[in-house]
């Protein structure tokens, strides 16, 4: 008589196994599966929670970097001198140059970029053969621990600088992981091509703390300038600027050659021509840039080669409160604030007034007031304020 192999009776389990019954496995497997599934779920939950716990553990109550977002007029002067000595328009492919970049200029540039992109603060400081970057980024919506504080130490080297030490709060970060995260962040921001091209230019980096500069030896490649121009002025912005210049030329054609035209009339006409919807901000920023270049008597073709084919507005005197120079200050500061932010606009405006005071034309509170008013107007444009409608 064959043994009963039915899985319905627990009393037959041992007999089924001993007799080699093919259904024996069906009896014991249900008792093993729940434990395996439980271990798998715990493992998956741990994998999901571990990064979150690490992130929460690195939040701190106080920022490592606490400073304002402002840019000093001295940094504007240093940047102007640096560009004059390394003007890319005068460089040929393969030219070898060494640029001495002041450490304070790098410091304020890093702080400005972190402020604009992450709403945080940053610093840069030199030491012997190394430099340190510190960044504090606020984390909204968390009570108590509210900042990510990052330190990264760079070492001078042939080619691009290398991260030799890094930490997030008190948690050490391996240098390779820090470099990977840096490259990934740059890629996510959409600057992979520009970053790769810039890295290919650099031949040597040297820190000179005694002189307070970073020596950057590079070999020029014109493609970098083309990448930078394309990044700064995408096709949509160029199309908006072309439309704004056409509208400006059409407006000014209605005035006589010696007319003194209130800036408000021209500006309101340009802004009114901006379309409603998502394109409004782009078109208004384009209008400010076109108007600023017109009043500064600069040719946009220097930045945008396509502008050579655009209509040329006739030269007239646009005035603000009866003054041509006030109209210039207002329009230029408004464009700077809309494109680069309020700190840069304020710094450039103050720098120009300081230079005027040294050059003989004198420091003008009226011009400075026009600068600040233009900066505020540019901020309203950048914010898409309904007050402009």
Ranges and model annotations:
Residues 329-333, 356-389:
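Alpha-helical transmembrane segments that form the membrane-embedded catalytic/substrate-binding core
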Residues 341-357:
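Small-polar-interrupted transmembrane alpha-helices in polytopic inner-membrane proteins
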Residues 38-258, 372:
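Extracellular/lumenal and peripheral-membrane lipid-interaction modules
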Residues 95-96, 167, 317-323, 335, ...:
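Second-shell loop/turn segments in exported
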Residues 5, 12-13, 21:
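Cysteine-centered motifs
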Residues 237-328, 334:
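Glycine-rich short-loop/terminal segments
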Residues 4, 10, 31-33:
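Intrinsic-disorder-associated, low-complexity terminal segments enriched in Asp/Asn/His/Tyr and depleted
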